[in-house]
Amino acid sequence: VDLFLLGHGYDKQPFNGEFNKALISNGDGSFSDVDYQSFESFYHGGASGDIDNDGDLDIVAVDGGRGKSLIYKNLNGQLEPSEALIDQALMNQMYNAELFDINNDGFIDLIAGGHDWSWGQNPECEWWSCNTYDNAPVIIYGDGVDFINNEFQRLPASGIDKQGIVTNFEFFDFDNDGQVEIIITRTGDNMNEEPGLPWDQ
């Protein structure tokens, strides 16, 4: 068993972040560690799946839109990170991700979510007093190569006020029609409230 650790760092200003780390089993109970220090960022979520259909697990790690969301291609057991394999513009405020073939075409898709709003979208606002939900979770459809210039789809707005932080995705065929639904778990976002109130958990 190998381990992959997402580097988050200290969750306070200036949110400097941290680098990711892999612990690769040596087969004798010990591990060799690999630090990806050149890709330090504010990582939150990730997932594993066979993105390129070569029979092994690749990894995605998302950093909330700082330009260093990564795809780690698995090349014979060596993880090679690249920020050029994922559309960074679609990763704005995306803090969680899953890999799942949602359209059943044989290619793994990337489903990402995080903050359902964009920072600073209205410069006349103080805090989040008049921001709106404009940054819904996104599906980037896979092609067996990367997630660049691919078709993508925004998920419908949740309609659940003040629960605009996506914490996880699950997949299940609720109505037995042969098509899998996406289950999204959320938590409170402090939107349109007074500053200084605690986050809902």
Show where each model-derived region lies:
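Repeated polar recognition positions within modular binding domains
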Residues: H8, N16-E18, F42-G45, D63-G67, ...
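Extracellular beta-rich repeat passengers
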Residues: T167, D200-Q201
